[in-house]
């Protein structure tokens, strides 16, 4: 059973990535509270815009890019090969996103409902959507990311299947469109139009179709049959196999 679950090494890496990402979620929640109070309130749908003395847009975009770099860096350290690193990134991103709202809600008293609208991201345009939408994506990322990291730890790296990758890209594109469609329409009006934007309807049918494709790609990759053994994979899986009490490195 321990081998199937990935052993202590696998769960140690999963826990380490999750704790790091959860701590980042708290830091993100605290930083966003400060920024939104500077701009007139924590609820982006009802706040009255107040322009601070210094423009913070460039700093905020840079902070978001730095956050992605931090998540990617810890994923590169946690994984040994493509499966572990990709899995660690999914786990870190999903945990960060979920814990951000788990910390933000009690600290700020908002959102009051999973259907409240929020500004989700700013790169390349503002992403708008109900809080529930990114939470669903984050949950799928956590489950599939942890599964990939555990599989790598036990030396059972799944085969990379390009049809699943294409399905995931298509699903991600559909979800991204639902988030930025309103901002893309308003972009012609410049920064003032983007600041004044308050979406009123979310394209749930398109989002759910994209989410189904994205989740299927995530989970399909995490559960795919193991790739044929290679010398590189043997080196990556050697620590997990050597730790097995029966020493049966080649018995499956």
Protein language model features and the residues they cover:
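Interfacial helix-loop-helix junctions of multi-pass membrane proteins
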Residues: 34-40, 102-121, 184-195
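Membrane-interface loop-to-helix entry segments
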Residues: 50-73, 122-144, 201-209
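Small-residue hotspots
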Residues: 87, 94, 138-140, 145, ...
């Amino acid at each position: 059973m321990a081998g199937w679950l990935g052993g202590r090494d696998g769960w140690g890496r999963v826990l380490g990535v999750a704790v790091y990402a959860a701590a980042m979620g708290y830091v993100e929640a605290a930083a966003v509270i400060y920024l939104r109070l500077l701009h007139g309130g924590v609820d982006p749908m009802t706040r009255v815009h107040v322009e601070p003395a210094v423009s913070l847009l460039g700093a905020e975009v840079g902070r978001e890019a730095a956050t992605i770099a931090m998540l990617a860096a810890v994923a590169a350290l946690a994984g040994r090969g493509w499966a572990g690193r990709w899995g660690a990134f999914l786990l870190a991103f999903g945990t960060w996103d979920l814990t951000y709202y788990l910390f933000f809600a009690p600290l700020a008293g908002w959102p009051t409902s999973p259907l409240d609208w929020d500004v989700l991201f700013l790169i390349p345009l503002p992403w708008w959507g109900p809080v529930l939408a990114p939470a669903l994506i984050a949950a799928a990322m956590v489950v599939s990311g942890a599964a990939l990291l555990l599989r790598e730890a036990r030396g059972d790296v799944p085969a990379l299947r390009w049809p699943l990758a294409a399905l995931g890209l298509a699903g991600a594109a559909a979800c991204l469109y639902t988030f930025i469609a309103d901002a893309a329409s308003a972009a012609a009006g410049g920064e003032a139009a983007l600041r004044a934007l308050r979406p009123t309807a979310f394209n749930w049918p398109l989002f759910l179709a994209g989410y189904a494709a994205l989740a299927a790609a995530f989970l399909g990759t995490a559960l795919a049959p193991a790739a044929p053994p290679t010398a590189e994979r043997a080196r990556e899986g050697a620590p997990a196999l050597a730790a097995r009490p029966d020493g049966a490195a080649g018995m499956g």
